[in-house]
């Protein structure tokens, strides 16, 4: 029998018969590993323990201790177990697809009746019975005709369509347990009992069109979440409860920040309070960019298709653009424009005005650029996913030798900004060259090394995401962690030699010849709309004093105190504090409750005692005690707190 060489993570290699399975490899290492093994990685591919290995390869055996692989298998198996449970409870239901998604999985079903909360409970119960039965999970490769016949016989039209879409020369992998079979690429666990029965929960039912096309039949999508332990599930459910309390849409209403409506889907109507947050954040970012050597520009929102064709965006992105056709006077044809979905091609146009020398580089151009992208109605979510948004966008035009220093400076700026905004930790992911790419390996080596050196220079930790860079260059993604442990990808840093070439950007080098600059796309917040949503949820509406839209309310206890209330408000406003008077004929406790719901950080209560002493009674948001302070003292303190950082 032919032999193959398998190389293990420690670098050691062993000979095995061709066709050996990872399960057999694990058992050959130790009885214990053979029992604990759940899957393998073979040449970087996640591999089922039952699949044969036919050629030399690098191999790693995975156990439940390997978080990523274990969760993928648990969630994938639960998708199959749920589909089986549904069909055992309601045999007429048709199954479609059930992938793993963040924190869990979903499966789409074709059923006449709507799934109810009681149905979800029954499905969960049957799933636990299947898990506790510890049934073996088996797999086979079938010929295409056999798979089609199998599903046609069982009246599963969606599965027939899926099989028919697979190339004719490919075999079909089938998995089954307990007599229930499903078409699947795998891998899976070895028996249903390996799935933790107390660490999953069915969460919700939603509508979904077959293959995501509204012209197709609408299905019912059941979502589930799953973890390795019951405690992890409980922690996740607690986080969801906290997230519901912090929902920026709910707080946006309570704080009178913004609204959205059907006449302008995905476009934000900012109210005075919300617009104040927006403008304060913009002023803060403008100051930080100015300090970092950026020059602010403004570019058009409506741009002729010719520029988008030249940049390559028309071909790749047209479906997500808002197209505007205009009948120009004396023109034979309509002019086709688009609302810009991104700012980068316009920034190259600014760069291209006038001859540039190497002495002009790096040139950092920043814009709070309004962009519009068509997002499907089902994907939009408050401020987090909109069609009209503003990016804190900037592009750095530089030489290859300047990439490392510019990247390091950007990471330091991003870190400082996140810290000012209350996010002390973030993750960096470096996405490296994909298989399909432009440029030489030598050029990729230089740029990837420059990014790694920049990260190390600032002392940051990072992970590498192999092959996930753009076809023209590597990129960095920055994920911050909020108060309840959720991660948000906001910042980006993308190296791009392609767009300057497409749009004719040049500079004169030290040698007197023309050269192409590198273009570094970078953002810190991502979009103002989404980042404000993140801020609201991170702080549960209790924004830092400098960022709060209404910083102080000065509330009268008796009407005779109204003149002094006006004096206090005027003194605060003169020092840059956003202060309002509340002299309504209402009890002070009512006023305090109302402004606390509105998340006003400081309420100054004033009665005749405060008038006579020229003092104020200070109540801070979330505290029950009050503090008496002199007028000058409180004005000085609040004026200092109101200053924008940086």
Curated annotation (Swiss-Prot):
Q: Which GO terms describe its molecular function?
A: ATP binding; metal ion binding; threonine-tRNA ligase activity; tRNA binding
Name this protein carries in UniProt = Threonine--tRNA ligase
Q: A single Pfam family, by name? A: tRNA-synt_2b
Q: What is the native source organism of this protein?
A: Cereibacter sphaeroides (strain ATCC 17029 / ATH 2.4.9) (Rhodobacter sphaeroides)
Name the GO cellular-component terms.
cytoplasm
What EC number(s) has UniProt assigned to this enzyme? 6.1.1.3
Quote the gene name from the UniProt entry.
thrS
What job does the chain carry out?
Answer: Catalyzes the attachment of threonine to tRNA(Thr) in a two-step reaction: L-threonine is first activated by ATP to form Thr-AMP and then transferred to the acceptor end of tRNA(Thr). Also edits incorrectly charged L-seryl-tRNA(Thr).
Which cysteines pair up through disulfides? They are none
**Catalytic activity entry:** tRNA(Thr) + L-threonine + ATP = L-threonyl-tRNA(Thr) + AMP + diphosphate + H(+)
Q: Please share the entry's free-text remark on the cofactor.
A: Binds 1 zinc ion per subunit.
* Necessary cofactors: Zn(2+)
Q: Where does Zn(2+) bind?
A: 344, 395, 521
Family membership noted in the UniProt record: Belongs to the class-II aminoacyl-tRNA synthetase family.
Domain TGS as annotated: residue spans: 1-63
Region (Catalytic) residue ranges read 247-544
Could you provide one GO biological process annotation from this protein's UniProt record?
Answer: threonyl-tRNA aminoacylation
């Amino acid at each position: 029998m032919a032999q193959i060489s398998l190389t293990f993570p420690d670098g050691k290699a062993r000979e095995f018969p061709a066709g050996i399975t990872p399960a057999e490899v694990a058992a050959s290492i130790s009885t214990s590993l053979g029992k604990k093994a759940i899957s393998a990685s073979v040449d970087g591919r996640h591999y089922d323990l039952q699949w044969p290995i036919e050629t030399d390869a690098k191999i790693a055996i995975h156990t439940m201790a390997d978080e990523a692989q274990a969760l993928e298998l648990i969630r994938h198996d639960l998708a199959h177990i749920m589909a089986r449970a549904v069909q055992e409870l309601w045999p007429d239901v048709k199954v479609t697809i059930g992938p793993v998604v963040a924190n869990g999985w979903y499966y789409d079903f074709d059923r006449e009746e709507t799934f109810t909360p009681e149905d979800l409970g029954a499905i969960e119960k049957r799933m636990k019975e299947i898990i506790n039965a510890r049934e073996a999970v088996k797999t086979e490769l079938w010929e295409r005709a056999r798979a089609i016949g199998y599903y046609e016989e069982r009246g599963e039209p969606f599965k027939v369509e899926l099989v028919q879409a697979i190339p004719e020369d490919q075999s079909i992998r089938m998995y089954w347990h307990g007599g229930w079979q499903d078409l699947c690429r795998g891998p899976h666990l070895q028996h249903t009992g390996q799935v933790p029965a107390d660490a999953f929960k069915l969460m919700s039912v939603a509508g979904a069109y077959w293959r995501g096309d509204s012209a197709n039949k609408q299905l019912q999508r059941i979502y589930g979440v799953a973890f390795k332990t019951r405690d992890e599930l409980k922690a996740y459910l607690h986080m969801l409860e906290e997230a519901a309390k912090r929902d920026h849409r709910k707080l946006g209403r309570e704080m009178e920040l913004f609204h959205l409506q059907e006449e302008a889907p995905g476009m934000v109507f900012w109210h005075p309070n919300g617009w104040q947050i927006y403008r304060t954040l913009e002023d803060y970012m403008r100051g930080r960019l100015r300090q970092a050597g950026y020059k602010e520009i403004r570019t058009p929102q409506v741009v002729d298709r010719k520029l988008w064709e030249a940049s390559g965006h028309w071909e790749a992105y047209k479906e997500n653009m808002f197209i505007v056709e205009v009948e120009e006077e004396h023109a034979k044809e309509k002019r086709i424009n688009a609302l810009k979905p991104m700012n980068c091609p316009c920034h190259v146009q600014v760069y291209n005005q006038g001859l540039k020398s190497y002495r002009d580089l790096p040139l950092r151009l920043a814009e709070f650029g309004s962009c519009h992208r068509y997002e499907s109605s089902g994907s939009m979510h408050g401020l987090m996913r909109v069609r009209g948004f503003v990016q804190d966008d900037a592009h750095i035009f530089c030489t290859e030798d300047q990439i490392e220093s510019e990247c390091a400076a950007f990471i330091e700026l991003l870190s400082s900004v996140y810290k000012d905004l209350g996010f002390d930790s973030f993750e960096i992911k470096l996405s490296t060259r994909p298989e399909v790419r432009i440029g030489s390996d030598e050029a990729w080596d230089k740029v990837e090394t420059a990014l790694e050196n920049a990260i190390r220079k600032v002392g940051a930790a990072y992970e590498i995401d192999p092959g996930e860079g753009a076809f023209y260059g590597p990129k960095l993604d920055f994920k911050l962690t909020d108060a309840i442990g959720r991660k948000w990808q906001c910042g980006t840093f993308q190296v791009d030699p392609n767009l300057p070439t497409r749009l004719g950007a040049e500079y004169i080098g030290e040698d007197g010849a023309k050269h192409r600059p590198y273009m570094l796309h970078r953002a810190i917040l991502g979009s103002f709309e989404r980042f404000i949503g993140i801020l609201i949820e991170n702080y549960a509406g209790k924004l830092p004093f400098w960022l709060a839209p209404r910083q102080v309310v000065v509330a009268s206890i008796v009407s005779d105190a109204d003149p002094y209330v006006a004096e206090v408000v005027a003194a605060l406003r003169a020092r840059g504090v956003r202060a309002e008077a509340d002299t309504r004929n209402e009890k002070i406790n009512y006023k305090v409750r109302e402004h606390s719901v509105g998340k006003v950080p400081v309420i100054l209560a004033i009665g005749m005692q405060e008038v006579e002493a020229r003092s104020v009674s200070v109540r801070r948001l979330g505290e029950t005690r009050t503090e008496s302070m002199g007028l000058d003292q409180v004005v000085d303190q609040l004026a200092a707190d109101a200053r924008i950082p940086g």
